[in-house]
Amino acid sequence: NQHVGNFPGVTVDRKDGVIRNHKEATVTDLPGIYSLSPYSNEEIVTRDFILSEHPSGIINIVDASNIERNLYLTMQLMELDTPMVLALNMMDEVRANGGTIMVNQLEEMLGIPVVPISAAKNEGIDELIEHAIHVARYRELPGRIDFCTAGSDPADPRGAVHRCIHSVGHLIEDHAAAAGLPLRFAATKLVEGDTLIEKALQLNPNETDILGHAIAEMETVTGLD
């Protein structure tokens, strides 16, 4: 069963439904996006929904034939501290083209269930639903990938971004809690220059100055801006 409406303030469809044989589970089909950066209505709608509605779980459906592009969003979603399952869609096409994806290794690396599916052929859907309900019911959170396994040297660019995010996290900890934002997600978005997150955190001028210095130091080490 499905109900179609609109998200407030935008002309983006909102589709809500329940899963057959799992009437207790309501599913909201969010717009397809490639990142949680607020550059389009679809990205804003998706991000705002996850941050404000606090869903019990996320089913992250990616195109298995273009997995590198899609995993960027997956990594961002993992920062939201919400149970998640990764669905590798179009696996039938991957196999037909002679490709393979090492699902077990990907699952181990990400710390979330990874389920190969084909939506067009209705393959793997039951398994996907069972995994999604399980992680939501038992609040099984994604693993955390630490990108600073090396680089204790302050001049080492490999760990500069991580150190900056860690430092910003300490700075905004109370603000993130007050705003109901996952700490690492908020810190990461601040380092990326996300003005909407900065506004939501309501930093004081001194904290804004400290944030600017932390980002400038990171950019000096990495050569990025």
Model-found features: residue ranges?
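Conserved nucleotide-binding/hydrolysis micro-motifs of P-loop NTPases
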Residues: 9, 32-34, 64-68, 90-95, ...
